[in-house]
């Protein structure tokens, strides 16, 4: 029996088969979870429905998290189709592309508001609205963060601030929902080759750097993140809440360099 057998999981943020949310859905499906999906805009509907079909699901609903009405409709949709919910996967983050140019000092007021609303407040809004569906089910919520919440990653800009706020939100929500028997955690994933990631200036250099420096010397995959999400949302992690779990092959533990001797050889030769 799979680790999530009999669990009902809502997956937000699936954009394509390279997205982290897709990797999570893939791992959840393998472990026996039933899946429902959201899409943010009409142009994404067909793609998300095709992805859902691949996992044997026809539960797909529009949810623009900047609209309270959409979030209420999401709850109604899940009530009508499932009646209850065990897991929420919050894989939602956005800032206008111009906010990734220049430095954080160039952040616009509107860009800041949008980034915080969609990337952070949406977690609060979804949790509050869907909590009644998780009553008595020892529910689990997982969201996605990144190392840019802790340290400066050039050009990540306002999204780094948003991710820092997201991690704090996880801790506060963990306290709030514990009395209902539910848990929430964040996964701080290393750089993954998603389409969204390539909107960040110099992302390919960031990938090269983190791969060279992390102790394993290899990149992170969506499967790595997906399998971690399975654990965090399973009963095996029943005593874990309010955590930020790094899934980055150990990159966050390093100082300036990792695999120093190999890097010296690359730079200076044998």
Swiss-Prot record:
GO MF: enoyl-[acyl-carrier-protein] reductase (NADH) activity; identical protein binding
Q: Which GO terms describe its biological process?
A: fatty acid elongation
| Family matches, as Gene3D superfamilies | NAD(P)-binding Rossmann-like Domain
Q: Which residues form the active site?
A: 146 (proton acceptor), 156 (proton acceptor)
The entry's substrate-binding residues are 95
**Function, in words:** Catalyzes the reduction of a carbon-carbon double bond in an enoyl moiety that is covalently linked to an acyl carrier protein (ACP). Involved in the elongation cycle of fatty acid which are used in the lipid metabolism.
Query: What is the similarity comment for this entry?
Result: Belongs to the short-chain dehydrogenases/reductases (SDR) family. FabI subfamily.
Give the quaternary structure: Homotetramer.
Q: What is this protein called?
A: Enoyl-[acyl-carrier-protein] reductase [NADH] FabI
Its source organism is: Aquifex aeolicus (strain VF5)
């Amino acid at each position: 029996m799979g680790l999530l057998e009999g669990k009902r999981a809502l997956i937000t943020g699936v954009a394509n088969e390279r997205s982290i949310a897709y990797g999570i859905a893939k791992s959840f499906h393998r472990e026996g979870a039933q899946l429902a999906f959201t899409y943010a805009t009409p142009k994404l509907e067909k793609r998300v429905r095709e992805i859902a079909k691949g996992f044997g699901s026809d539960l797909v609903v529009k949810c623009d998290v900047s609209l309270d009405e959409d979030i209420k409709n999401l709850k109604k949709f899940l009530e009508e189709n499932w009646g209850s919910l065990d897991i929420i996967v919050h894989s939602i983050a956005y800032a206008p592309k111009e906010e990734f140019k220049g430095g954080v000092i160039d952040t616009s007021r509107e860009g800041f508001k949008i980034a915080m609303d969609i990337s952070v407040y949406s977690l609060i809004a979804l949790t509050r609205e869907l909590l009644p569906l998780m009553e008595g089910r020892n529910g689990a919520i997982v969201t996605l963060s990144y190392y840019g919440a802790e340290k400066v990653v050039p050009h990540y800009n306002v999204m780094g601030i948003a991710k820092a706020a997201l991690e704090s939100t996880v801790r506060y929500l963990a306290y709030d929902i514990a009395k209902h028997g539910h848990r929430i955690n964040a996964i701080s994933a290393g750089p993954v080759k998603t389409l969204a990631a390539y909107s960040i200036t110099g992302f390919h250099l960031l990938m090269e750097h983190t791969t060279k420096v992390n102790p394993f010397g290899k990149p992170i995959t969506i499967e790595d993140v997906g399998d971690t999400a399975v654990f965090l949302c399973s009963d095996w992690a029943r005593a874990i809440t309010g955590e930020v779990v790094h899934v980055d092959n150990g990159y966050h533990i390093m100082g300036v360099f990792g695999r120093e001797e190999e890097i010296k050889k690359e730079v200076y030769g044998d």
